[in-house]
Amino acid sequence: LGAAKMTASRAFDELAAADPSIVAAEGRRRVLRPGRDKMAMWRHLEPRMSSPVAREHRLGRVPDAEIPLGGLSALCGLSMLQDDPWPTFAATKAQERTLKLAADARDAGLDEPEDPACVVQVLRYEPVPAPGCAVDPLSAILSLPADERDDPRVAGEIENVLTRVLGGDHEGNR
């Protein structure tokens, strides 16, 4: 994943604190042992997970770069939802610097327009693109704000995506 050793260690500590049964020691390494019901594990751990989005830029132009879809746009690519009029992209902090989003957007007044051309979510970690050039489904779900997740249509499609990715309650581990 390209995460620092300390970050990975901290993540394992937090997972072990939430549910000690899913983290096992193999010598000096710690590994995940999710068990048969991945959906149950997700439901147990998801409230403790934070959004992967560090910051968000609402831009008046679409960046000229290859960055994966993120947030609602990524979820729409995996489901029957219709996307917002503007796409949402997921970028790394390095891409944010390369695209000069942090400084240029504020200085030029390009950030935060009422009707943006796109939204760029800067993620706390390197996004792993899923097929179709979108972030992975679980990151897409976690990056949605609470008001979008509470929408009944979005909540229903989140359930459908989770069932496909993690398997239904009755299907166990895939």
Located regions from the model:
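Short gly/ser-rich loop at a beta-strand->alpha-helix junction or flexible surface loop bordering the NTP-binding
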Residues: 47-125
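Short amphipathic alpha-helical interaction segments
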Residues: 3-17
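Minor-groove-contacting beta-hairpin "wing" of winged helix-turn-helix DNA-binding domains
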Residues: 28-35
